[in-house]
């Protein structure tokens, strides 16, 4: 009896194997995803926040930093250090309150927005310029300026990387900041 069960199971397995070998496999053509282009629209820079064009000019010509930031009404704080997090050579801020001072030269946090006006800061760190705003329309305006300046999206992600030649601009949506390198 056991012999018949073994023979029946072997015949069944062979039948399944032979049946599956004779089935034709269907091939599928690879699907080519269409490339989406970012829409570039002409945008008017906000008067309260430094424009991307002026920030690029400051990056190219560091001697123009004081004149450009004065034009927008930014105040200067040198050697701004967020305790155990960041250190900036220069921190220009507008409509912001500096965080609480923990030690002689270390602050508790980044600048905080005030209720009046569009709050922003421009920070200089390790050869990069960081522009941060505190509301979504101002951030969207900065990103639109980046696109209008001819930068193309190179790497999308949590921080969208735009490139133009050897210049790179990173737009961090969650932090509402733009970093020019």
Where are these regions (language model features)?
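Bacterial N-terminal signal peptides that target proteins for export
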Residues: 1-10
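C-terminal motif of bacterial Sec signal peptides marking the signal peptidase cleavage site
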Residues: 17-20
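Bacterial signal peptide processing site
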Residues: 22-24
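Coil residues (strongly favoring Ser/Thr
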Residues: 38-39
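Amphipathic alpha-helical segments
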Residues: 57-78, 135-155
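Long, charged/polar, surface-exposed segments that mediate recognition or autoinhibition
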Residues: 92-159
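Short, exposed beta-strand-loop hairpins at the edges of beta-sheets
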Residues: 157-174, 179-180
């Amino acid at each position: 009896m056991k012999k018949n069960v073994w023979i029946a199971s072997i015949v069944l397995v062979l039948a399944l194997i032979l049946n599956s070998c004779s089935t034709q496999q269907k091939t599928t053509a690879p699907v080519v995803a269409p490339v989406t282009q970012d829409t570039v629209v002409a945008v008017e820079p906000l008067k309260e926040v430094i424009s991307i064009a002026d920030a690029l000019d400051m990056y190219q010509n560091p001697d123009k930093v004081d004149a450009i930031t004065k034009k927008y009404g930014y105040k200067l704080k040198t050697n701004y250090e967020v305790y155990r997090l960041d250190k900036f050579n220069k921190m220009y801020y507008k409509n912001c309150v500096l965080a609480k001072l923990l030690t002689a030269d270390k602050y508790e946090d980044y600048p905080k927005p005030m209720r009046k006006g569009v709050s922003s800061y421009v920070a200089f760190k390790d050869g990069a310029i960081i522009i941060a705003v505190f509301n979504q329309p101002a951030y969207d305006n900065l990103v639109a300026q980046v696109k209008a300046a001819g930068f193309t999206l190179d790497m999308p992600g949590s921080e969208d990387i735009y490139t133009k030649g050897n210049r790179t601009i990173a737009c961090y949506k969650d932090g509402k900041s733009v970093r020019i390198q």
